[in-house]
Amino acid sequence: MPSRYARIGDRIISIGHVTDREAGNAAAQPVGHGANHSKTGAGAEMITIPQLTAQALGSFLAQETKGRFVASQAGLTELLPFAAKLTLECIGNSDALYHDIEHTMLVTLVGHDILVGRALARATTADDYANFIMACLAHDIGYVRGVVQGDEDDAFVADLSGRKVRLPIGSSDAALAPYHVDRSKLFVIERLDAVEEVDAARIARAIEYTRFPYVTTPKEDADDLNEEEGLLLRAADLIGQLGDPNYMRKSNALFYEFEEIGLNKTLGYATPADIVYRFPQFYWTNVAPQIQLAIRYLNVTSSGRQWIANLHSNVFRAEREVNLSGPQR
C-alpha cells in the first residue's frame, strides 16, 4: 500500500498508508478549483503518490528559497520544484523496499533544516542552498534501474568508467546498492549539468561523501566548503534515516535490502530484529561521530531540534527495548 502524506504548516509528514480504495477515491477527486485536468477515457487524470510528494516538496522548497533568499537567484524558486519532480518521480518507479521516495523526502527535509541552521550561523548563499538540496534529492537515485545513460534491460552502468553489471534474475533495485553512489553522480552530470543555475560537479562531490563505509574523518570545523557540504549531506542521509519516527518499523524493509546484496552476513544480522538490537551500538560507534557538525546547525532552530529529538528517541527505544512497532522481538 502506498504511503499517505500530508502538509501541516510548513512540514510534510507521512501519516501512514492509504488503502487501494482510498487511493482510488483520491484519484477521482478534483484537486483545487478551476484547475484543468487532462482526461484519459472517461476517468480523471491518475494521481500518484510520487507525483503528490514531488508537488508538495517542490512547493515547500520554492517557498523557502523565495523567503530566505529573496534578493538573489529568483530562478531557483523554479529550479527546485523541477528537481524535486525529476528525482522523486524517477525514484517512485523503484522497487527497492527501503530506499524509496519517503527516504529521499526525509533526507531532503533534514538537509533543509541543516542549511537553515547553517545560514543563521554563517554566510550561506542561495546557490549553496539550492545545490545542497539537489544533492539531497539525487543522492540515492542511482538505485533506480534505467535512469543512467547506457543502462540496458539486462545490464546496468556500475561506475564512472561505464563498466556494466548484470543482476541475478529476480533482483530488485536494491541489488545496485554497491554501485548507487557512482550512478547517482552520473545521473546528476547527465541530467543537470546543462542547467545554468546548477553546479553538477559540486553536487556530485557532495554525493561522494555518502559512500559507505566512510573514508573521510569529520573535523569539528570543516573550513573547505566542498568538504563541509559533503559531510552535511552524509549527516542528512544518516539523520533522515535514523531520525525517522517510523524507522523501527522499516527495519524489515532494510533487512531484506541488505539480504539481497549479502550485507546481513557481513554485519551479523540474522533477522530484522537484529537491526533494532544493534542500533544503539551502531549509532554511538559509527553514526554519532559523523553528524556532529550537522547537529550543531540543527540545534539552532526548533525544527532542527525536533530531528535531534527524533534521533535520540529512536536510540532510547532500541536501548530500552520499547517494542511499540517494528519487527517481532
Regions found by a protein language model. Give the residues of each.
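Alpha-helical phosphate/pyrophosphate-handling elements in metalloenzyme active cores
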Residues: 93-131
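An active-site-proximal "capping" alpha-helix that borders the catalytic cofactor pocket
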Residues: 107-108, 177-193
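Non-catalytic interface/linker regions that flank or bridge core catalytic/transmembrane domains
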Residues: 5-20, 24, 30-82, 86-96, ...
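Divalent metal-dependent phosphate-bond-processing catalytic cores, especially two-metal-ion Mg2+/Mn2+ enzymes
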Residues: 34, 38-67, 113-128, 138, ...
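Post-HEXXH active-site segment of zinc metalloproteases
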Residues: 147-170
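Short alpha-helical scaffolding segments that buttress acidic/His motifs in well-ordered protein cores
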Residues: 83-90, 132-136, 203-211, 232-236
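Active-site flanking loop/helix segments enriched in acidic
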Residues: 82-109, 166-174
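Hydrophobic/aromatic-rich structural module bridging two neighboring secondary-structure elements via a short loop
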Residues: 126-137, 168-176
